[in-house]
Amino acid sequence: MKIVIINGSARKGNTLTAINAFIKGASEKNEIEIIEPDKLNIAPCKGCGVCQCSKGCVDKDDPNPTIDKIAAADMILFATPVYWWGMSAQLKLIIDKCYCRGLQLKNKKVGTIVVGGSPVDSIQYELIDKQFDCMAKYLSWDMLFKKSYYATARDELEKNKDSMNELEGIGKNL
């Protein structure tokens, strides 16, 4: 299976740690590519609608080839830290740019990893889950998993062996 991971974090912290644990389990049987929006030139969606009549966004920025990779994937893993009760701006930019290829993103397998600085029963995780639930319903996604983790210190998640084993197991069982 071809898996595209969109890393919504610009830092090399807990979100990346979670991604790496998932990859450790998934890499044996799957082809994996990581997209790092913070390293791309991305103009915000203008809402012009031209993309609905042509192939891709009129902006000649990095998301056009990036969205091709996402559209070609069998599975998309969205990984994000929590910023202001929502997903990171980096991840949201990529999601907004996917509007131009919405129908090509239908029927994908999807997973989410959300890492925040509040306990996992806090509203911030629920708000992010609801956004992804709405996208999943609209695009007929098969939501394989939604995982939320609490970690504030740089290496806190890595020290949580139960969480690391859980993420590795999810990857391995795909």
Regions found by a protein language model. Give the residues of each.
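Short, solvent-exposed loop/turn segments at secondary-structure boundaries
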Residues: S122-Y125, D155-N160
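N-terminal beta1-alpha1-beta2 submodule of the flavodoxin-like/Rossmannoid cofactor-binding fold
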Residues: M1-A79, W85-R101, M143-K147, L157-L174
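Active-site rim beta-loop-alpha module in soluble metabolic enzymes
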Residues: A151
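Acidic, low-complexity intrinsically disordered regions
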Residues: T80-P81, K137
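Short, glycine-/small-residue-rich phosphate/pyrophosphate-handling segment
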Residues: L105-K146
